[in-house]
Amino acid sequence: MSDALKHECAVAMVRLRKDLSYYKSKYGIENYGLSRLILLLEKQHNRGQDGAGIAALHLHPEPGRPAYQRVRSAADNPLADVLQQVGDGAEFHSELLLGHLRYATFGRYDVSCCYPFVHESTQLGRMLLLAGNFNLTTNTEMYERFLESGHHPASHADGYLLLQTIAHYLDREESRTPGMVNLSGVLRAALQPLDGAFTL
């Protein structure tokens, strides 16, 4: 990649494919996934100074325990603030981690605009965490499509609208084929009408 790094959002994801005990045994690190995610975010730190967030999705949570943990910050030094909130990382000991550094081109400078965004559900197959870099030109059309379909969107922000669009198709697919969601089909349907630049 020869392009100069500019001020843009950064997205990082870690997916551990083996049991968590394997990484502790091999590397001697209790929370290997979180340490890798932090390293990826620190390496991209120049890309986002307006906000930061980290989420850990537990693929097999015990009943009665949350399926994910998330911290976000819009403090003066957001990544350092997020890492302080994470502390020893015990709650973030997980197989799937998602991080984001925000460079605000639109929207407010506030924690509600910081990714990862979450679409809540008590059904694990319908829960969605999203982080990305969005500059969509079809926000108005997406917003109007939501209104016409009986939804009540709480924001015009492109990230929010995209989260709700993906969640709509995910819910529909999960209802049609419970436990056997075709995620590539869900994303294809949700992203098809988009125009602009984005990274998920």
Residue spans for each PLM region:
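Conserved short alpha-helical segments that host acidic/polar catalytic motifs at enzyme active sites
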Residues: 1-200
